[in-house]
Regions:
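Membrane-embedded, hydrophobic transmembrane alpha-helices
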Residues: 1-72, 76
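Internal/C-terminal transmembrane anchor helices
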Residues: 71-89
Length: 163
């Protein structure tokens, strides 16, 4: 476990490592659970998210590189601007206004509906390896990682629009 004070750059680097490890382990564990139960279930989703969280915490605690140079003020400024721009682009992909749903960019209209379809399809417990929900009788060849992770969050009780 790292001892002493950590720089902001070290904390950001370790947090990013922890989040990537947590997400990856949750997805891999979820897919293993889905294969063993012929579809993802709520207990499988909880187990997957829990194992991902544990792996992410361990990665955060033990991923310190003592030889990594400290970030400069310009590096931190660039990371902050990138973080703000990313938050702006992804935080409001889908949001409610009154009784209607809206999207931030009309360019996301077709793509977002595809992702929502995949998330709901996985969360409903589709048999694994699933067929394409769009093309009948064709195995799914789409990279499912992010959509599968969001389906785990849906099964854990998080609303789709928040994931």
């Amino acid at each position: 476990m790292p001892l002493g004070r950590s720089s902001p750059g070290d904390i950001l680097s370790r947090a990013a490592t922890g989040l990537l490890v947590a997400t990856s382990i949750a997805v891999v564990t979820g897919i293993a659970c889905a294969f063993s139960t012929k579809g993802i279930t709520q207990p499988g989703a909880m187990l997957s998210l829990g194992s991902g969280a544990l792996a992410g915490i361990l990665a955060y605690l033990f991923s310190r590189d003592p030889n990594r140079p400290a970030l400069s003020a310009w590096d931190i400024l660039m990371l902050a601007i990138f973080g703000i721009a990313s938050f702006r682009a992804f935080a409001w992909l889908l949001y409610a206004v009154g009784n209607s749903w809206r999207i931030l960019s009309p360019n996301n209209l077709g793509d977002l509906s595809l992702h929502i379809q995949f998330i709901r399809y996985f969360a409903e417990g589709s048999p694994f390896w699933p067929e394409s929900p769009i093309l009948s009788g064709v195995p799914l060849t789409y990279p499912i990682g992010a959509d599968f992770f969001n389906s785990l969050l849906c099964l854990a009780g998080m609303p789709l629009e928040c994931g």
